[in-house]
């Protein structure tokens, strides 16, 4: 098995996370200069191969595999359809809360929504829209949830600051309306 193939496999399993030359060198027990040369060869291979949809990008000494820009439209369509059809209203509510209040715990999300959010959190993690990001320094050390880079890509933004600004009073009004809808639903059952 070639060094190039090993590096490619590691880049593939790393997914959207960046990997540094130093990390690859440690994993493969090779000198960083050899890893750097292999990465350059791999990058050239992807550039020349017109039948490959992959590309290798580098930022600040870290690398990751991505799809070539010419595939962006088809990938946007693919990524939109299943999530739009599969995310329930509770999952969308949970995602919105995390996007605006992150980092946030499940208990804090539950308090805002008024119901248990475990199922919604699991679905959002499966879609790679959110991830665990450490523990809150309180009794029980609950997980903290944040949105992912994929969430930003999916929303078509580069930074969370680009999310629409929501007035705190508007949020409270929406929460009150949502709470009222739940009471009506409970009374009708």
From Swiss-Prot:
GO terms for biological process: cell division; chromosome separation; DNA replication. Participates in chromosomal partition during cell division. May act via the formation of a condensin-like complex containing Smc and ScpA that pull DNA away from mid-cell into both cell halves. Its main location: cytoplasm. Belongs to the ScpB family. Keywords: Cell cycle, Cell division, Chromosome partition, Cytoplasm. Homodimer. Homodimerization may be required to stabilize the binding of ScpA to the Smc head domains. Component of a cohesin-like complex composed of ScpA, ScpB and the Smc homodimer, in which ScpA and ScpB bind to the head domain of Smc. The presence of the three proteins is required for the association of the complex with DNA. The keyword Plastid does not apply. The keyword Cell division applies. This is Segregation and condensation protein B. Pfam families: SMC_ScpB. One of its GO terms (cellular component) is cytoplasm. The gene is scpB. It is found in: Cytoplasm.
């Amino acid at each position: 098995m070639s060094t190039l193939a090993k590096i490619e496999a590691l880049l593939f399993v790393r997914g959207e996370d960046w990997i540094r030359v130093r990390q690859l060198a440690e994993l493969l027990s090779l000198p960083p200069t050899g890893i750097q040369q292999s990465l350059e060869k791999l990058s050239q291979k992807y550039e020349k191969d017109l039948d490959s949809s992959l590309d290798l990008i580098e930022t600040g000494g870290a690398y990751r595999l991505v799809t070539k820009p010419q595939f962006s439209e088809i990938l946007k369509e693919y990524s939109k359809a299943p999530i739009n059809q599969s995310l329930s209203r509770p999952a969308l509510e949970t995602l919105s809360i995390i996007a605006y209040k992150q980092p946030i715990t499940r208990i804090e999300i539950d308090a805002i929504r008024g119901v248990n959010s475990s199922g919604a959190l699991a679905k959002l993690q499966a879609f790679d829209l959110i991830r665990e990001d450490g523990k809150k320094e309180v009794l029980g050390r609950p997980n903290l949830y944040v949105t992912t880079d994929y969430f930003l890509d999916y929303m078509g933004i580069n930074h969370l600051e680009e999310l629409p600004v929501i007035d705190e009073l508007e949020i409270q009004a929406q929460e009150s309306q949502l709470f009222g809808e739940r009471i009506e639903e409970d009374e009708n059952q």
